[in-house]
């Protein structure tokens, strides 16, 4: 398994992976995007906002990591639902820490308990919570600092 920069040829697969992984969490609601909406957002953000990476094993993509380096932020980190718990997330998180060695921030939904446990396990600390007006639920702001 390697982490490499994603290319436009990967975008359709990664957009579907993002959607499928989000749906597998089980916290979606009526305000969430359709598969087509996620694809449109993915293509736009990949072109305008993200440094995008993928976890690849042979010819299969298993995860995505979307960084916003100017904000030292992980915007998205998702693993194929079949690959959860296999170390792919750890591989992507370690890569993010190498890309942003001075510290990282990220946001997740409060009820995304598996992600919150993952971030805590990888040295992130909860800084604050606030209401997310789009999804109408609480979101958590996390930060990682070197040495933590």
Q: How does the language model describe each region?
A:
Residues 1-3:
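Extreme N-terminal starter segment of soluble prokaryotic enzymes
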Residues 5-82, 93-95, 99, 132:
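Acetyl-CoA-dependent GNAT
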Residues 50, 137-141:
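Short hydrophobic/aromatic beta-strand or adjacent loop that forms the aromatic wall/cage
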Residues 80-82, 86, 110-111:
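Active-site acidic-Proline motif in GNAT/NAT acetyltransferases
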Residues 90-91, 111-128, 134-137:
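Conserved active-site alpha-helix within GNAT-family acetyltransferase domains
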């Amino acid at each position: 398994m390697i982490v490499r920069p994603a290319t436009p040829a990967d975008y359709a697969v990664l957009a579907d992976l993002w959607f499928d992984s989000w749906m597998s969490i089980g916290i979606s609601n009526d305000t969430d995007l359709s598969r087509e909406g996620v694809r449109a957002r993915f293509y736009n953000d990949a072109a305008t906002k993200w440094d995008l990476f993928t976890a690849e094993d042979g010819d299969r993509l298993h995860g995505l990591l979307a960084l916003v380096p100017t904000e030292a932020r992980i915007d998205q980190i998702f693993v194929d639902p079949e690959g959860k718990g296999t170390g792919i997330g750890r591989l992507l998180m370690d890569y993010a820490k190498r890309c942003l060695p001075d510290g990282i921030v990220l946001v997740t939904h409060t009820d995304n308990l598996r992600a919150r446990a993952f971030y805590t396990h990888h040295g992130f600390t909860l800084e604050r919570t606030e209401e997310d007006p789009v999804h109408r639920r609480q979101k958590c702001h996390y930060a990682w600092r070197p040495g933590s």
